[in-house]
């Protein structure tokens, strides 16, 4: 029994981010059952005056690592640093990777993961570009799943850590009396504050003025004469906090794990 404890401790502390693993560690992890590859895309885009443009990448890394840890049978692949996004010279700092190019990259990397020995590949994204049932993630996942499932490998698109978790937690905050917000709003800013332990990504001195254009129902036009703020924020981020960010982080991870487990069970 005494000998088993160090082995358990070593397994628990073993790296699960493939960039931090040697090839022998990857081989051992695959042999031990960590055969799910998690691909999570980030992005570089303007996120309001208070948030650095690399927020998607900063959030994606710990999120996908936590998902892998909680699943127990997964390894986090390197975060892809670019994704489809809008661009404007008025708000510089965004870099758009068109959906077709992202699809080519995802397809190649997913097939490489299968060649390496992974039997399940999961595609996820931290940004909205290319997501949804008709988006590039879903398209690539279906194409590769149809191609490889007869040989025992599956490829899935897991969207709920973005779409479902964001919607649900936004509703929770609104019920608690917080303002609604989407891009650069209270959700994004709070999550970045929670993860930004080195104070590199969030300009906390600008939070007091971090309010942008209001969240409107889809299709609703601004009132006549309304002058857009156009600062990269949709909503009101002034009450953002690391405490809210921690709750949101946990909700995103739990939502992703639940969906991925359901997808794995469908094998």
Predicted regions and their residues:
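Extended, histidine- and acidic-residue-enriched regions that form the cofactor-binding/catalytic faces
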Residues: 2-86, 90-100, 104-122, 126-267
């Amino acid at each position: 029994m005494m000998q088993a404890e160090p082995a358990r401790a070593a397994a628990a502390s073993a790296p699960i981010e493939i960039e931090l693993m040697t090839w022998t560690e990857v081989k051992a992890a695959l042999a031990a059952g960590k055969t799910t590859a998690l691909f999570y895309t980030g992005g570089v885009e303007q996120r309001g005056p208070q948030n650095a443009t690399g927020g998607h990448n900063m959030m994606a890394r710990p999120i996908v690592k936590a998902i892998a840890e909680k699943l127990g049978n997964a390894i986090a692949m390197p975060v892809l640093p670019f994704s489809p996004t809008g661009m404007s010279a008025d708000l510089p700092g965004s870099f758009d990777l068109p959906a077709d190019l992202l699809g080519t990259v995802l397809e190649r990397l997913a097939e490489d993961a299968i060649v390496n020995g992974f039997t399940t590949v999961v595609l996820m994204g931290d940004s909205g570009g290319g997501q949804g049932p008709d988006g590039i993630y879903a398209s690539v996942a279906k194409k590769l799943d149809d191609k490889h499932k007869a040989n025992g490998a599956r490829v899935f698109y897991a969207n709920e850590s973005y779409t479902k978790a964001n919607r649900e937690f936004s509703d929770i905050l609104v019920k608690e009396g917080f303002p609604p917000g989407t891009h650069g709003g209270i959700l994004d800013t709070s999550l970045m504050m929670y993860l930004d332990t080195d104070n590199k990504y969030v300009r906390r001195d600008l939070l007091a003025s971090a309010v942008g254009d209001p969240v409107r129902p889809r299709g609703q036009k601004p009132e006549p004469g309304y002058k857009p703020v156009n600062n990269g924020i949709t909503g009101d981020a002034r009450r953002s906090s690391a405490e809210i960010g921690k709750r949101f982080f946990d909700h995103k991870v739990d939502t992703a794990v639940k969906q991925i487990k359901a997808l794995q069970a469908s094998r």
